[in-house]
């Protein structure tokens, strides 16, 4: 899961959006460094990541990647799941338009950025004004995201090439998304994540 799915599941679970969004920027035990609700959000994010990676559908999705890209497939899939969520948002969340949801999340997160890691603050300079989460619905934007990540971190250079496997197996990935994401939503709603 990437930014959009973490915010969506956090909302369903009534968890801190700030904690869930910044979790990847916090190392180690967050207890004592942040308010309890933010710590709980960070921990929810980590549980969601762990659960998602262990799902049979996600393990199956990794098998669609070529050998040269399988190592980075967990990262590629995190971004791809956000693509399907953005693309099918109104089917999954019929009561709230995507932009309304994103605006609400932004209004909860931005006033509290001063207490967050600098790298996370820098992310927020681009995430909201460039409308990343709305643009996740656009497949060319997903290619751009993967390419930018590969340039920023040379060890992840294969991310850029992994997009060809997305194109080749797009519908298979989409079927797998529909098999697991509604279950994740239900787990979040019932506080079972």
Swiss-Prot record:
Name of a matching Pfam family: ACP_PD
Keyword Transmembrane helix appears in the UniProt entry: no
InterPro entries reported in the protein's UniProt record: ACP_PD, ACP_phosphodiesterase_gpbac
Group of enzyme by EC: hydrolase
EC number: 3.1.4.14
Highest taxon, organism lineage: Bacteria
One annotated GO biological process: fatty acid biosynthetic process
GO molecular function, one term: [acyl-carrier-protein] phosphodiesterase activity
Statement: the UniProt record of this protein carries the keyword Lipid metabolism: yes
Record's catalysed reaction(s): holo-[ACP] + H2O = apo-[ACP] + (R)-4'-phosphopantetheine + H(+)
Keyword terms, alphabetized: Fatty acid biosynthesis, Fatty acid metabolism, Hydrolase, Lipid biosynthesis, Lipid metabolism
Family: Belongs to the AcpH family.
Cited HAMAP family: AcpH
Function according to Swiss-Prot or TrEMBL: Converts holo-ACP to apo-ACP by hydrolytic cleavage of the phosphopantetheine prosthetic group from ACP.
Name this polypeptide is given: Acyl carrier protein phosphodiesterase
Protein's organism: Pectobacterium atrosepticum (strain SCRI 1043 / ATCC BAA-672)
Top-level taxonomy: Bacteria, Pseudomonadati, Pseudomonadota, Gammaproteobacteria, Enterobacterales
């Amino acid at each position: 899961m990437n930014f959009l799915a973490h915010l969506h599941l956090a909302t369903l679970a009534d968890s801190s959006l700030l904690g869930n969004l910044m979790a990847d920027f916090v190392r180690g035990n967050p207890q004592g460094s942040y308010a309890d609700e933010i710590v709980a959000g960070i921990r929810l994010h980590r549980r969601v990541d762990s659960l998602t990676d262990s799902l049979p559908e996600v393990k199956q999705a990794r098998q669609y990647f070529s050998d040269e890209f399988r190592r980075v497939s967990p990262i590629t899939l995190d971004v791809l799941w956000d693509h399907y969520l953005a693309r099918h948002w109104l089917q999954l969340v019929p009561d709230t338009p995507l932009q309304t949801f994103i605006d609400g999340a932004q209004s909860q997160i931005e006033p509290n950025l001063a207490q967050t890691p600098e790298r996370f603050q820098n992310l927020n300079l681009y995430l909201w004004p460039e409308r990343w989460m709305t643009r996740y619905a656009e497949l060319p934007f997903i290619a751009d995201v993967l390419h930018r990540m590969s340039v920023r971190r040379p060890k992840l250079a294969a991310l850029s090439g992994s997009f060809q496997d997305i194109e080749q197996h797009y519908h298979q990935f989409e079927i797998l998304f529909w098999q697991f994401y509604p279950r994740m939503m239900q787990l979040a709603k019932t506080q079972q994540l």
